[in-house]
Amino acid sequence: MCIDIVGKKILLIGNGFDLAHGLPTSYKDFLDFCKMVRELYTYPIIDNEYNQKKLIDWNTDKTIKSKLLECYENRKNCFEDKITTQCKELDELYDCIKENVWINYFLEREKYIGENWIDFESEISNVVQAIETLKGYIERDEDVLKIKDTKQQTIIYFLKIAKKSLQDVFNLKRIDSFIEDISIELDKLIRSLEIYICEFVNEIDINKENDDIKTITPDYVLSFNYSNTYERIYGQSKKVTYDYIHGKADIKNNVDTCNLVLGIDEYLEDDKNDKLEFIAFKKFYQRIYKSTDSTYMKWVEQIKKYPEVNHNLFIFGHSLDKTDRDILKLLICNDNVTTKIYYYRKNKNDKKELGKLIKNLVRIMGQDELISRTMGEHKTIEFIPQTVFVAKNN
């Protein structure tokens, strides 16, 4: 029996997709939101005018500000022992962040860290690797003061933020307990991000769209985002198969059921199958443990099974960072896949973002393969400047 296999169009989107549509989804946006929420729940009643002005002057979307201002009014009129805003989702979010060691750490380190989620993940990785080094010294009964300066500084700084001393974690039982505690704190941070996406970001009215995206009409959308932005703007009336590879934000979840993936890349080589104390921080583990969608693997299987069938991959708003190397290579590095990578530019001569994408592709596939796929006789990769966003037609 002859089966007619038709090539597919796959759209791959990253956080740059949401940012390009004016949504406050950067790591800094989320951290600023957490700061504002903390102040909302902790300010003295006599300072209410000052805090209201801070909310009004805050440079963020008006939808978020109006929701927090409403919560502010409820908080101002609350005289119960337990502080609430009559918004149970925001109350839950505050419970997750109020004494969260990771939030505290990032607020303290804010001016030293970039604004992207990659910078956020890199900082977590630095802390994890430093604490893993500390545990190794404790296991071998070695002098922890001989740990390299950079890691030693990270350890001491993070312990200070966690209101701990070296003595508090200076045996195997204590440090294992500490590792478990900061893993739970990361879970709380992830849940607070889920609430932020569901209750605030997804409620923002998006008033612009992009012709590049509109004309693609994909069969599949592979989203590295937690939000439903593409579905809301472009996918309402189309038969599209979605794969939210890092999970899709759902307000019905809680800390235990939240399936969003936010972690670090594997940094070990020879010991990666033996040193498992920090496995819960790693993306591959979270994807398995949280049962995130892996429908994209079926697409890859079809691509490889029928090499004579040509497919089209469109990438928009993804940095092509090496942390997603395994997935990107499976899709891009196929002779029957034509890849179009859209990049942002401020003007016709601006190639800053293009340069970053090229560097990241070298890290993913190596120079030789990148050259053959962009300049060879049978090139499969093309870089395309994004068209200007226009007002959305309602």
Describe each model-derived feature in a short phrase.
Residues I46-S291:
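Extended, H/D-rich, highly charged conserved domains that either
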Residues H21-G22, E231:
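Short N-terminal helix/helix-N-cap motif within the alpha/beta-hydrolase-1
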Residues M1-H21, Y27-F30, V37, N48, ...:
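SIR2/sirtuin-family catalytic core signature
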Residues D271-F281, W299-I303, K329-L331:
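A glycine-rich, aromatic-flanked flexible loop/lid motif
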